[in-house]
A protein has these predicted regions:
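Generic cytosolic/nucleocytoplasmic N-terminal low-complexity/intrinsically disordered segments
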Residues: 1-2, 48
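Sec-dependent signal peptide recognition
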Residues: 2-8
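Detector for intrinsically disordered, low-structure N-terminal pre-sequences
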Residues: 8, 18-20
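N-terminal signal peptide c-region/cleavage motif recognized by signal peptidases
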Residues: 14-16
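N-terminal beta-rich core of secreted/periplasmic extracellular enzymes
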Residues: 20-164
Length: 164
């Protein structure tokens, strides 16, 4: 009987704790963003703030914050995935067309596919999966001025008119 009572007490306690997390001001979408951010930052410990600055941020269960992985790339399509996604030419090749409309469409396709992959993981309860976040390190916006630089193909070239 004691075990059953303890089980129910723990269940009710956990539901109450979850309800408290859901009612925190930083989770209230009706509040201004600045208020929500200040509330969240005030609740985070120094250790939690440091952990959130890593590319793989662990979950913070006491605040209901899921794990998140900030590292992903979509230079010419969503990278590092086993799913079938669209792969476009390198940025310098796309830039050579001078077709900014096509570049916009490629960006839209890439972002839609990235969002779909993230949503699949979210529905499956997988948070913090490597290379499956919504943060993409792309494009490389530097002007390619020196051929000795090894990342020139990741840029839109040396033409300032096109690159802006």
């Amino acid at each position: 009987m004691k075990k059953i009572s303890l089980y129910f007490v723990l269940c009710f306690w956990s539901f109450g704790a979850q309800a408290q997390v859901e009612n925190l001001p930083f989770r209230n979408a009706d509040l201004p963003l600045e208020v929500r951010v200040k509330d969240l930052v005030a609740r985070l410990t120094l250790e939690e703030k440091v952990l959130l600055m890593q590319h793989h941020s662990p979950a913070i269960p006491r605040l209901g914050i899921p794990a998140y992985d900030w590292w992903n790339e979509a230079l010419h399509g969503v990278a590092r995935t086993l799913e079938e996604v669209t792969v476009f030419p390198q940025a310098i090749g796309m830039a050579a067309t001078f077709d900014t409309e096509a570049l916009q469409k490629m960006g839209d396709i890439t972002s839609t596919e990235g969002r779909a992959l993230f949503n699949e993981d979210w529905k499956a309860g997988k948070t913090g999966t490597r290379y499956r976040g919504l943060t993409y390190w792309t494009p490389n916006i530097n002007i390619f001025r020196d051929p000795r630089w090894g990342r020139g193909q990741e840029t839109y070239g040396e033409d300032p008119y096109l690159s802006t």
